[in-house]
Each structure stands twice: as C-alpha cells, then as structure tokens.
Regions:
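A short, Lys/Arg-rich alpha-helix, primarily the initiator
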Residues: 2-40
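Short amphipathic recognition helices of helix-turn-helix/homeodomain-type DNA-binding modules
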Residues: 13-14, 76, 80-89
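DNA major-groove recognition helix of helix-turn-helix
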Residues: 28, 57-58, 68
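Residue-level signal for the short linker/turn that defines the boundary of a DNA-recognition helix
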Residues: 36-38, 49, 67
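Residues within the helices of the helix-turn-helix
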Residues: 40-41, 70
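Recognition helix of helix-turn-helix/homeodomain-like DNA-binding domains
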Residues: 44-64, 73
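Short, basic alpha-helical nucleic acid-contact segments in DNA-binding proteins
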Residues: 64-65, 79
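Hydrophobic micro-packing sites on short alpha-helices
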Residues: 68-76
C-alpha cells in the first residue's frame, strides 16, 4: 500500500520543494486534513517499526539513508522523475 492512491489537491508539485522533509510534512498534513491519519500509519507505510520515525525525520531529528529514502519514495507512490528528484533532495 502507498499514499499514491490518495489525491492531494492542495499539494504543490514536488519540483517546487527543495527539502524532502518539507515535502513529507506537506504530504502528512494534506493526508491528515482529508482523513484520519497518523504518524504511526505514515511510518508503517514506509516499513518502519518506530511509530514516530517519520515525525522525527520531518522535525530534523533523524535523517534518511539512501535505502530509507527509497522506501519512503515508494510509500509516497513516487515514480520516475518525481522519485529521482525526491531521492536527490
């Protein structure tokens, strides 16, 4: 499962972002705005066991390795140039 099945109407295009943390936070905020969503669910979608791992990343208290970056990109449903851009941020 990934977040790609959800339509994010108020999201900026990923190319407008310079920081993956800001993009992840906006995805979380938009998903939370339109339904019940939690950091636990966001972390689980990316395959992390810590329920607050994604929150820690967005707050700058933890970083994503290249491997983890790929897992997050997949959970966000990013493909092609969007995935490449995300992984280079």
């Amino acid at each position: 499962m990934s977040l790609s099945q959800f339509i994010f109407i108020d999201m900026k295009n990923i190319l407008k972002y310079k920081d993956y943390r800001e993009y992840m936070q906006d995805v979380y905020n938009e998903r939370k705005r339109t339904s019940v969503f939690s950091w636990r669910e966001f972390s689980a979608l990316a395959g992390f066991t810590s329920p607050i791992y994604m929150k820690l990343v967005c707050e700058g208290k933890s970083s994503l390795s290249k491997t983890k970056m790929g897992r997050v990109a997949q959970s966000l449903g990013l493909e092609g140039y969007e995935r490449e851009y995300f992984e280079q941020m």
